């Protein structure tokens, strides 16, 4: 019995549910091409701002024993760079499944401007609006402000009619899950992506008695194994609260087929990999695909739909 990882997401069919997390291995055209030619089912661009951004001073990304700490500050080549890349790729491979395009403006107005540019372009893929970057000094995460989130989405959907998902930060309280889900259910969202890194963690070099990243006095977003339980909880919480039309992309702590299986069991439709992709490179997709298939075949599953979202309670 052979397990299939074929994944239907919106109107697209992907060979498997795996993709990069925006921010990892997607800064430049060569990196994006490498993703496209890898075993990943899909890929997403670097979160784009209107103009090129250098980001925060280095060191700003450090691998630590169970994951990573980063305070990148949204370095990117600017929206026109990535839009040109995806439009060229659409023309070259018209039958390929949809590309994901990420934007992360520094303000509501910038986000609206970015989305208007995408709306007016020939881009026919899926857009992700990042409302949860924790690493830009002086810029709070929009998605922790429920009123501002609702205001943003009202303005976005007044004109934007292409498929749109949003990337959320982690939440830690049932009341916050309830409030955010109620807001999101009011809008024609394609998906939510849970989670972005756990913001404002601190990692210390004991020998130097120092922090390990330079920006924000060492405070940075935490990724990797550290965040998997939080990521799973957020995936599950939104899967059980959102309208079934709003899909879930699970992100956080995926480094093995077992981790992927857990995210899918909680209700995720697609899976993004960040920290472990940074450590291992694009060959990770082939390994995790094989490991997930092995788990499914051992359990007698032939497709992901047979177990997605079917997490048992005690």
Swiss-Prot record:
Keyword Electron transport: no
Record-listed E.C. numbers: 1.3.98.1
Source organism: Saccharomyces bayanus (Yeast)
Pathway(s) this gene product operates in, as recorded in its UniProt entry: Pyrimidine metabolism; UMP biosynthesis via de novo pathway
GO biological process, one term: 'de novo' pyrimidine nucleobase biosynthetic process
Listed Pfam families: DHO_dh
Any one GO CC term of the record: cytoplasm
UniProt family annotation: Belongs to the dihydroorotate dehydrogenase family. Type 1 subfamily.
Name of the protein in its database record: Dihydroorotate dehydrogenase (fumarate)
Keywords per UniProt: Cytoplasm, Flavoprotein, FMN, Oxidoreductase, Pyrimidine biosynthesis
Catalytic activity: (S)-dihydroorotate + fumarate = orotate + succinate
Active-site residue numbers: 132 (nucleophile), 133 (nucleophile)
Positions contributing to FMN binding: 46-47, 130, 167, 195, 224, 252-253, 274-275
